[in-house]
Amino acid sequence: MGSSQSVEIPGGGTEGYHVLRVQENSPGHRAGLEPFFDFIVSINGSRLNKDNDTLKDLLKANVEKPVKMLIYSSKTLELRETSVTPSNLWGGQGLLGVSIRFCSFDGANENVWHVLEVESNSPAALAGLRPHSDYIIGADTVMNESEDLFSLIETHEAKPLKLYVYNTDTDNCREVIITPNSAWGGEGSLGCGIGYGYLHRIPTRPFEEGKKISLPGQMAGTPITPLKDGFTEVQLSSVNPPSLSPPGTTGIEQSLTGLSISSTPPAVSSVLSTGVPTVPLLPPQVNQSLTSVPPMNPATTLPGLMPLPAGLPNLPNLNLNLPAPHIMPGVGLPELVNPGLPPLPSMPPRNLPGIAPLPLPSEFLPSFPLVPESSSAASSGELLSSLPPTSNAPSDPATTTAKADAASSLTVDVTPPTAKAPTTVEDRVGDSTPVSEKPVSAAVDANASESP
């Protein structure tokens, strides 16, 4: 509860008459005065900011006459105006039937003492104090400090003490007569725990919201209006409604006729026809039927889907390393093919005189460099021209034949045979070395005859 006021009091000040107790059926009760929270600040426009007989005189002057009373509520922190009629005929004591005390309402809610645990057979239990819901708000004397209550209890040892107690459960104040006794058999003179401070103040508006709540049990003859969201119509029991035909159920059943999930789905249609429009629940037998559904082709029953083949045959293990014509192999490089050169035939190994035959494996053939297309016009004669001059060569025909034979074999291994190769070799050899014309020609002819 806040201790500061939110409105300005007419005439200024923070003083008034604190309403402590309101008797039943009294003029103050009919005016709506609320104990502990209400402060009478003025009557008929007269500000009550002093502790004198002004309030009594105004009430006596207006007996059986309605007067206007301005009330400040520390619960709502607002001012309100009410009408009260002082009377001696209502059947109780006083003209208003209320107990009041002049004090300041600024900080009045801070001086409260919260009743905590209450021991059995203690003076507090015998006086009717209720644990955790009772708040001691005052006594016959003014208490402004926390020690004022304990001092008052010590001075009333074994003597009756009147306390004003507010209860949050009943939202009302009452007078409690308690007799402090330190020899009651327990701790303390009251036998109860008392809290003081910020954490033990009276909660703000404890029952204002709760009073507006009306339970359905209090209105036995009033039928409960169903909600418009449809949730009140959902029945959680297994008993079906007597006869309900919601319009949305028929459309759902018609739209589901074209959807063939299994051969006979009777369980689904029975659930949709129960009449429950919002929460259709599937019974357990649906799951049993779904477990026995044979494999089917969804393209035959569901429209708008791409048709799938009826079944896939058992495929053997495929060799994933087979290169497709449109897929470049991921590992390795493709073979370099020169479009201007025909493929080279495999040559048999040469048996040279005096040298052991050297086998030429086929796996070493791709390691030889290929002659580019620009040098394809070069003949074997150019390769022979790089040999040493024939003037320095020995005159032995067999040696000349062997060299020519070796040169001819080198030329055949590197460059493909062409039609112009023999003529070019004969012309170049004839121009440079006329002495070895016949042996070279014979060697070339021999090679040509030996080639496959």
Swiss-Prot record:
Subcellular location: Golgi apparatus membrane; Endoplasmic reticulum membrane; Golgi apparatus
Biased composition annotated in UniProt, kind: Low complexity: 372-424
Biological process annotations from GO: cell differentiation; establishment of protein localization to plasma membrane; Golgi organization; organelle assembly; organelle organization; response to endoplasmic reticulum stress; response to unfolded protein; spermatogenesis
Membrane topology qualifier: Lipid-anchor
Effect listed in the UniProt record for changing residue 451 to D: Phosphomimetic mutant. Partial disruption of homodimerization
Region (Disordered): 372-452
Residues with a covalently attached lipid (N-myristoyl glycine): 2
Region (GRASP): 15-215
Start and end residues of each stretch annotated as Important for membrane binding: 194-199
UniProt GO cellular component terms: cis-Golgi network; endoplasmic reticulum membrane; Golgi apparatus; Golgi membrane; membrane
Keywords: Differentiation, Endoplasmic reticulum, Golgi apparatus, Lipoprotein, Membrane, Methylation, Myristate, Palmitate, Phosphoprotein, Repeat, Spermatogenesis
Residues modified to Phosphoserine: 214, 409, 436, 441, 449, 451
Modified residues (Dimethylated arginine): 30, 47
Modified residue annotations for Phosphothreonine: 222, 225, 415, 433
InterPro entries: GRASP55_65 (IPR007583), GRASP_PDZ (IPR024958), PDZ_sf (IPR036034)
Ranges where the PDZ GRASP-type domain occurs: 15-105, 111-199
Post-translational note: Myristoylated. Myristoylation is essential for the Golgi targeting.
Summary of subunit composition and partner proteins: Homodimer. Homooligomer. ER stress induces phosphorylation-dependent monomerization. Interacts with BLZF1/Golgin 45. Identified in a complex with RAB2 and GORASP2. Interacts with JAM2 and JAM3. Interacts with members of the p24 cargo receptors. Interacts with CNIH1 and the cytoplasmic domain of transmembrane TGFA, prior its transit in the trans-Golgi. Interacts with KCTD5. Interacts with TMED2 and TMED3. Interacts with SEC16A in response to ER stress. Interacts (via PDZ GRASP-type 1 domain) with core-glycosylated CFTR in response to ER stress.
Role of this protein: Key structural protein of the Golgi apparatus. The membrane cisternae of the Golgi apparatus adhere to each other to form stacks, which are aligned side by side to form the Golgi ribbon. Acting in concert with GORASP1/GRASP65, is required for the formation and maintenance of the Golgi ribbon, and may be dispensable for the formation of stacks. However, other studies suggest that GORASP2 plays a role in the assembly and membrane stacking of the Golgi cisternae, and in the process by which Golgi stacks reform after breakdown during mitosis and meiosis.
Family membership noted in the UniProt record: Belongs to the GORASP family.
Protein name per UniProt: Golgi reassembly-stacking protein 2
Organism expressing this protein natively: Homo sapiens (Human)
